[in-house]
Amino acid sequence: MARSDEDSWDLASSVGATATMVAAARAVASRGPEALIDDPYADALVRAVGVEYFVKLLDGEITLEADNAAMLAVMTDVMAVRTRFFDDFFLSSGLPQAVILASGLDARAYRLPWPSGSVVYEIDQPEVIEFKTRTLADLGASPAAELRTVAIDLRDDWPRALRDRGFDPTAPTAWIAEGLLIYLPPDAQDRLFDNITALSAPGSRLATEFHPDAGARIGASSQRMAEEWRRHGLDLDMADLFYDGERNPVVDYLRERGWEVEARSRPDMFAHYGRPFPTGEAVEALRQSLAVTATRR
């Protein structure tokens, strides 16, 4: 089903199901002695959502055709590298405030070693926030920093909701927008960065990722995966969730608004973390993706 300005979701449907998919990839990527990441909560969160396909995937009960199995392995590696990039961003920022936009099943507030006095804000749809908070509490997990959830759709007035939860716009902040931009219309992407800029004191930092020609390139490979998923009973076509249209390049957009920006390609990020970047047609859509970090002047 195509997106609309008023659509909503839980963690088993639409955009929310992609958060569960990413958590499943993090759970798989956390296994083994050479795992690049360690997310001890991802597996339990995915099982709590209860989407049968993702649970079977965790249990090794899904058999995919060769091309799709290879694509799944690539996506698991991509999520491992992406997760580690954002983990390292927070760990290196040293800032007292952190904001996770569209937090989904992100458990960084619980699993990262935050400095004493850190405050972490998570912003997402109310149902998503409630589910994750309740599930982690049931698991006996406690946040490793002061966690303040902001239950609001990013299409609404989230800056006001964030300030109402105690956010201090005069203090430097570390922001992440992970796996988010492709699900926003181009004009909403611009508004997101405008709002972040307005809320960011000098010294604030931002990490995100940008996929040039995202809709066309990633949509085609997503459709192939959707066909495979349907064979296993999962009705999720990610291509329907992406917004097409020409986007302002993130690097240029941020620089024009007072940020010092660095960008690294996905193959460079793989090399940085000691992982070979895969080859083949299936991964060409991923090659152009950029890991972006910025500091507010």
UniProtKB/Swiss-Prot annotation:
InterPro entries: Ppm1/Ppm2/Tcmp, SAM-dependent_MTases_sf, SAM_mthyl_Trfase_ML2640-like
Chain residues that bind S-adenosyl-L-methionine: D124, D153, L154
Protein's UniProt keywords contain rRNA processing: no
KW Transport (keyword) present: no
Keywords in alphabetical order: Methyltransferase, S-adenosyl-L-methionine, Transferase
Pfam families: LCM
Enzyme class: transferase
Tree of life domain: Bacteria
Molecular function in Gene Ontology: methyltransferase activity
Enzyme Commission numbers on file: 2.1.1.-
Protein family: Belongs to the UPF0677 family.
Record-linked PANTHER family: S-ADENOSYL-L-METHIONINE-DEPENDENT METHYLTRANSFERASE YKTD-RELATED, S-ADENOSYL-L-METHIONINE-DEPENDENT METHYLTRANSFERASES SUPERFAMILY PROTEIN
Known role: Exhibits S-adenosyl-L-methionine-dependent methyltransferase activity.
Name of the featured protein: Putative S-adenosyl-L-methionine-dependent methyltransferase Mjls_1072
Organism annotation: Mycobacterium sp. (strain JLS)
